[in-house]
A protein has these predicted regions:
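C-terminal beta-signal and terminal closure region of outer-membrane beta-barrel proteins
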Residues: 95, 159-164, 208-242, 331-334, ...
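Transmembrane beta-strands of outer-membrane beta-barrel pores
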Residues: 23-29, 50-52, 69-75, 132-138, ...
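Short loop/turn motifs that connect adjacent beta-strands in outer-membrane beta-barrel proteins
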Residues: 16, 51-63, 122-125, 176-182, ...
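Conserved small-residue
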Residues: 157, 174-277, 404-407
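Solvent-exposed loop/turn elements at secondary-structure boundaries
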Residues: 55-109, 127-162
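Extracytoplasmic gating/loop element in the C-terminal half of outer-membrane beta-barrel translocons
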Residues: 28, 303-397
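Outer-membrane beta-barrel signature, preferentially recognizing the C-terminal barrel domain
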Residues: 1-6, 86-128, 155-177, 276-282, ...
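Outer-membrane beta-barrel transmembrane domain signature of Gram-negative proteins
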Residues: 1-18, 69, 81, 100, ...
């Protein structure tokens, strides 16, 4: 249960300067038995309308700069300050808690600031909105090992510093010519995250010893020792992925093929970073064309960069039921070094019955699509004695994948329980193309 008090204040001066202040205090039941009974987080925003303060060139009809600083707090998982019995799903028994109770837990906090610019020019035909932001998330919880003589196996440490920074740009256009109207809006967004600190330098709350943690294995994106693995390192990103296996090679870097045409997989104890799941940037372009009650809308979207993993493709290749394996058989095999390797031997080496070895089943997540197409028609108001506006419309979404190299839609997620399963395919349903119609009545 969370009980909160929120307050805000807004001040303005001569329609030129605007100041906004907010503050919120939460009393969270998860803080029970903790030294801290509640947590407070404020924000402040300031904007200046330059077009009201200065004489600007005629081409600029409106200009505003803005900046803000915000703190957002959230509580940790429940029962960390007062652990109870834990249910073992394998034995179906309730067991003693394994996590050492903590009484000095603090809320996780994200401190962020941003600056922005809004411009309108050429008699409001064009508008530009630009924002740069940076945020740092602190006091994240992680578990560390403690001596079993304490009666527990794990203790909670609050540490970490994850930084996100990015840029958001939007450029719009709106005009009419002899009854024909066109409005357009293009967007560009990018975000870069970086693990500034994990738990290095923190102190084990039970032993009092310094913790050395500059790397954290988050988990496998599928079958262990087959799928790629997300590993957090100080200085890396939150979605860096690593692989452990590759086709066995000789000293010259050539893939080894024995006299019977067989290949092998070599596993390494040292993982190799191959990229991350995040997009380099995202693009969007929305257009509306209007003429005499007709409105045609077109939305294009693009995601550029990042990697995607398909366990499905690895399994289908392994059993020889994929289009890729069929094409390889028709072509007489797979070209390796200066010869051909039997398709079955190749795919049953890099693929498995539980997914394909990550190095060979990672794809670019770049994709461009026709996100939405709509057509609306507003009936003449005189048909309804000028008392109502009636609009009829049809709409289609996800209509056309213009460009995509991955064998699945990279925008789908294999799981809703973790952000790390974005761009991962494990026999998911294909993305859907939707069609609909609507009737809108306004009085």
């Amino acid at each position: 249960e969370i009980q909160s008090v929120f307050a805000s204040a807004e001040l303005s001066w001569r329609n030129q300067l605007y100041l906004t202040l907010t503050g919120r205090n939460d009393w969270d039941s998860k803080l029970a038995f903790s030294d801290q009974a509640s947590f407070f987080y404020p924000s402040v925003g300031l904007s200046a309308v330059l077009s009201e303060m200065f004489e600007l060139p005629e081409i600029i009809t409106y200009a505003k700069v803005r900046g803000s600083y915000t703190v957002v707090a959230s509580s940790f998982d429940r029962y960390l300050t007062n652990p109870g019995y834990e249910y073992n799903a394998q034995t179906h028994n309730w067991e003693n808690p394994t996590v050492y109770p903590m009484d000095n837990m603090k809320p996780e906090k994200t401190k962020s600031w941003e600056i922005g610019l809004n411009l309108k020019f050429w008699e409001n035909r064009f508008n530009l909105d630009a924002t740069y932001y940076r945020s740092n998330t602190l006091n994240q919880t992680c578990k560390v090992d403690i001596p079993s003589s304490s009666g527990y196996n794990k203790a909670i440490v609050q540490a970490g510093n994850v930084q996100n920074q990015g840029l958001e740009l939007a450029l719009g256009f709106n005009d009419k010519w002899a009854g024909f109207g066109w409005s357009s809006n293009a967007t560009f967004t990018l975000n870069r995250n970086k693990v500034k600190r994990l738990a290095s330098g923190s102190v084990n709350p039970v032993t009092g010893e310094a913790i050395q943690m500059d790397e954290m294995n988050v988990g496998w994106l599928g079958k262990e020792n087959v799928a790629p693995r997300v590993i957090l390192t100080e200085g890396g990103s939150m979605t860096d992925i690593y692989v452990y296996n590759q086709l066995t090679k000789d000293n010259n870097g050539n893939i080894k093929v024995d006299q019977n045409g067989n290949l092998g997989i070599t596993s390494s104890n040292t993982p190799v970073k191959v990229g991350n799941l995040d997009a380099d940037f995202n693009l969007g372009w929305t257009n509306h064309f209007t003429y005499k009650g007709i409105d045609l809308g077109v939305v294009l979207s693009a995601r550029v960069g990042g990697l995607a993993y398909s366990a499905t493709q690895g399994i289908l290749d392994y059993y020889g039921v994929s289009e890729t394996s069929a094409t390889a058989r028709d072509n007489g095999g797979i070209p390796i070094n200066n010869g051909m390797v039997d398709a079955q031997k190749y795919y049953q080496t890099i693929g498995t019955g539980e997914g394909g070895y990550a190095r060979y089943y990672l794809y670019s997540a770049t994709n461009v699509r026709l996100q939405e197409l709509s057509l609306n028609y507003t009936l003449p108001k005189r048909w309804f004695k000028n008392v109502a506006n009636v609009t009829l419309g049809i709409v289609g979404r996800n209509l056309w994948m213009i460009y995509c190299k991955a064998p699945f839609d990279p925008e789908l997620s294999a799981s809703t329980s973790s952000n790390y399963y974005m761009n991962v395919d494990y026999f998911m349903q294909p993305s859907l193309r939707n069609f609909g119609f609507n009737v809108k009545v306004q009085f």
